[in-house]
Amino acid sequence: MNVTAVESNTVVLPDHARPARQNWALYLFVIMIPLQNIYVQYLPDFGGGLNFLNLMFIAAFLMALRCGGGLVRGTGVNGWVMLYLAGGVLALMIGLGNVADSTGHGNALKDKSIAVTFLFLAQMSVTDWTGLKRLFLASLVPLPYMFYVLRDQNAAVSAWHYTDHMRISATFMDLGANEMAAFFVTACLVAFGLLIGARVSWGWRAALATAVTLMAVGVVLSYSRTAYIAILAGLAVILLLSRIRLKLMLPALALLVVLPVLMPPAAMERFESISIEEEVRDESTDSRFVFWEEAIHHFKENPLVGIGFHNFHHAEFSSHEMDVHNFFLRELVEKGVLGGVILLGLIWCITRLLWRGLAIVRPGSWYGGLVLGLAGAWVALLIGNVFGDRFTHYAMIAHFWLYAGLAVRGLQLRYAELGAEPDIEPNPEPNLELRDMERTA
């Protein structure tokens, strides 16, 4: 495969030419966006759209313009994401006349879109490796507090045997346990990829190991069966793509052996209840198949452009007035074939971005660890979306788009280091030709 050059629409000056500007508003936004319990409960809403989410987005965007990073061209990611956002606007307009009450649909699309724009804000705000690392570090800052809230809530409901009362949401007060778990899965896998894939200082290792540990425990205490499957699949992907996979194989097998002993009995009960067989699946799993049948029915009736954004859970389309509980089916039923094609393009370009990144990384580099972890998180996210919607809740998904933006900028910076336009077959194994071309970052 010919790997084309990746460039920015803004020239990045050498480090000695001028100091890189910092997007302090984006740092704060990244830290705060998963902490719904703080800004929803305690920060004022002045009305007229003057709330925390909107004001922070405006501030971060204006400061991003000053940073001079621009958007990276040549990956296809930005273009497909823009199509994805435009498809949402089209679906919103189509759907306004399909339900009796569409109140809140516009705000829902706006909030979801703000999370997606983290992809652009990251690229616009970062012009060098130092800025990239700082922005990632900001995403780790809220994790200890989130774990503290999780532990506090879990202490109030914990029991030996599992009950639905044990499903908590930590800082995601407007969401549920599954969304909380999906955030923890992403954070855990990206941090784990950096921990094993990058040669970093002991300070960084301590921060990454802490993040991995806290988020892994958070996933366990979420009692989300989808998250259990997703994180195991993501870990498997990271191990398979890692250059030290043979060294990690024995510890990984040992962990699988002792994991049932380490996990709380209630979590093991939850894990053992995973099944899609009709005779043994529980009510929660069984209900999803009902929602999916209804979604497929309405998709067949409106195949081209769908029934409209955020419409399926209305009584006009869902007999249970529930969400589809499958992101891919939701895109099809609400946006039709057009939305499905855009989604496939989006999935392909992100997968290709990660594959290209793995092909040219310097062994042991910080960027290599980021792409490695994000590859596992991407697979986990796709799996999680089969049994729910892990892609549209802004508080949960914003950090994923941030990491994707950092991966896009990192790819451009890596090509700038190489000073060439190599013809590379994507291969996670060390590339000797590239290693000879490298210089110390």
Tell me the role of every PLM-derived stretch.
Residues 160-163, 168-173, 266, 275-293, ...:
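Long extracytoplasmic/lumenal interhelical loops at the membrane interface
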Residues 22-32, 85, 211, 355-388, ...:
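Loop-to-helix entry and N-terminal half of a specific, functionally important transmembrane alpha helix
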Residues 61, 86-93, 113-118, 131-166, ...:
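Alpha-helical transmembrane segments of multi-pass inner-membrane proteins
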Residues 1-94, 99-103, 107, 127-133, ...:
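Transmembrane signal-anchor hairpin modules in multi-pass inner-membrane enzymes, especially those
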Residues 46-53, 107-112, 172-187, 226, ...:
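Membrane-interface micro-motifs in multi-pass membrane enzymes
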Residues 41-42, 99-103, 157-170:
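Membrane-interface helix termini and inter-helical loops of multi-pass transporters
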Residues 151-154, 217, 239-279, 283, ...:
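A membrane-periplasm/extracellular boundary helix in multi-pass inner-membrane enzymes
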Residues 98, 126-130, 156-157, 161, ...:
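Membrane-interfacial segments
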